[in-house]
Amino acid sequence: MSEAGAASEAVRDAALRLLARREHTRRELAQKLARRGHDPGYVHPVLEALAEEGLLDEGRFAEVFVRSRVERGQGPVRIAQELRQRGVADGVIDEVLEDAEVDWLAQARAVRERRFGAGVPADRREALRQAQFLQRRGFTADQVRAAAAAADEDDERGPYG
């Protein structure tokens, strides 16, 4: 085997070992392989081949990523931002978030209740603190308002609706 063939095979083996652990984006995989000393001239053709073979799939990565972040209680804004940082295209992000079938309003409400309890905030300062918490978690302003309004409605209906 030629030197170029051996180098290309080494890159492929390293990439497959990384992909065996978890899904990666093309950018993540290229960065990890470069940090391990692999020549970028060999990395990019190998990544192309892996993508053509279906072994490197950013859509699949994004689906797994969205599921894990939803389980952690993160909102769509933060999830999209993190996917962009990892090099996932906006079209893929939009598609995956839409296909995730997450009720973001219910998610925001559940995250708020898990952190602060089901009661209504005692004052404006507490309401602001809760809203800022939800925004940091990646929920939109509309989702934050809806979660706060749901707490108000629950409080007015009492514990038995």
Curated annotation (Swiss-Prot):
Assigned GO CC terms: cytoplasm
Per the UniProt record, one Pfam family is: RecX_HTH2
Query: Would the keyword Cytoplasm turn up in this protein's UniProt record?
Result: yes
SS bonds (residue pairs)? none
Q: What is its main location?
A: cytoplasm
A biological process (GO) of this protein is: regulation of DNA repair
Give compartment(s): Cytoplasm
InterPro entries noted in UniProt: RecX_HTH_1st, RecX_HTH_2nd, RecX_HTH_3rd, Regulatory_RecX, WH-like_DNA-bd_sf, WH_DNA-bd_sf
User: Mind listing the UniProt keywords for this protein, alphabetically?
Assistant: Cytoplasm
Coiled-coil parts of chain: none
UniProt lists the family membership as follows: Belongs to the RecX family.
Quote the PANTHER family the UniProt record gives. Answer: REGULATORY PROTEIN RECX FAMILY PROTEIN
Q: What does this protein do?
A: Modulates RecA activity.
Question: What is the designated name of this protein?
Answer: Regulatory protein RecX
